[in-house]
Amino acid sequence: PVAPKKVQVALIALLAGIMLPALWIYIRSLLNTSVHTKKELKAGVNIPFLGEVPLEKNKHEKDIVVQEGSRESICEAFKIVRDNLDFMDTEKKTVGKVVLVTSANPDSGKTFITLNLGMSMALANVKVVILDLDLRKGSLSKSVGIGMKKTGVSNYLSGKVDDVKELVQVCGDDNRLHIITSGALPPNPAELLKSGRLD
């Protein structure tokens, strides 16, 4: 029988202890597709970068944090996005603009961004109507305390309501920001959105 060489075993264990975690970290970095910086975002997509909103862990996701006269960094971030949207519009339409806030995943901050960007625009004396097109959950309507009003987008798209002005409600405490709720949740949301009445 041959006794194990303790120095050789210790060196192999040390190398394995260094190499295996390093290999694991390298593989995870290759498989990680998330974006962490503005530079990574600009390199990954060919669209204009409007701004970034800091993560506010102590704020409730559905709170409107943009307030008149506030100098908080999150309020300033929304004002920068608002101003950049305005600068992108070189034609300066007088009719109106549409801004779509969307994402591939639920709970990614769409409601928070929509409400605060809308409030930022309203504070700049822009008439704002937020349209809740989530015909499956109506989360935007719920978050501002309006709830599921009997008349909303689904009622208009199904032809039960003809005058859009009947659907507009004041959003929260500020009368400059308005919302059209999703309305009663329909059994066929995809078909309603394709109905052509949204054009």
PLM regions: where:
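Conserved acidic segment of CheY-like receiver
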Residues: I180
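Polar/charged helix-initiation
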Residues: P1-V2
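Short boundary/hinge segments that flank catalytic cores
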Residues: L11-V129, L133-S154, S158, D162-E166, ...
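Active-site-proximal beta-strand/loop segments in catalytic clefts of secreted hydrolases
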Residues: G183
